[in-house]
Amino acid sequence: MYKDIKVDPAQLEAALDARLKIRAGFDKPTAGMAAGMTQVNMISVPRDWAYDFLLYAHRNPQSCPVLDVLEEGIYATKLAADSDIRTDFPRYRIWKDGEMVDEVTDAREIYNAHPDLVTFLIGCSFSFETALQEAGIEVRHIHDDTNVPMYLSNIKCEPAGRISGNMVVSMRPIPSHQISEAVKITARMPSVHGAPVHIGHPESLGIKDVNKPDFGDASRIEAGEIPVFWACGVTPQAAVINSKIPFAISHAPGYMFITDIPDRAWMG
């Protein structure tokens, strides 16, 4: 749970401006937007599947840290004022029987056609990137204005009911001398994925080519840098695919919802 701390009015304004910009049609990855404000992933599943998913998230908290749950017919989250999860992500993916069938920028009609959906908002590693930058650690995909690279790993998540799947991981190249600091910073923020799950040796995670991510864009890895992998909130989408959930709506990887909660509120 986040700490109730005073929020800079300028940060709140930046977060609201970002949501309004997205609502008006902004369609790019959100890393670096409203810097210092928490971003979240999303998955909506039918009520009949909601308990299974809640249990799945509970059993896999590093990859699926639940920050809010919205009951059917509820589209505003306590994490942000003047919010609508049907319009405030830049892109949505529509899933049927484990297959992605569409990608849209406004999901209101789809939610209206499926009123039984329960929505889970999941912590996102974008929320520790400002802390990394403040420590002098470059976040490559922000620097290069690309999407973070994400990979389906060979790490099996703990199954729950009808839901199972493997962990998706995100990667950031970190200079070898800064890795210990990156671990210390992110370990303090378990609600947004916490410490890395793996350092170096992508092949150990079943990643054949680190330059060919399953989601997002490849990141440059310079001499002296090591690929560092964190659990990722795209893991629920891997579960949707593997479990062939009859219907689901998710965000598009890297296209997040921006909240009114400062990143530092999650620091332990």
UniProtKB/Swiss-Prot annotation:
The keyword Lyase applies. It holds the Pfam family D-Glu_cyclase. It is an enzyme of class 4 (lyase). Keywords: Lyase. GO terms for molecular function: lyase activity. InterPro entries: D-Glu_cyclase, Putative_hydro-lyase, UPF0317. Its EC number is 4.2.1.-. Belongs to the D-glutamate cyclase family. This is Putative hydro-lyase ABSDF2257. It comes from Acinetobacter baumannii (strain SDF).
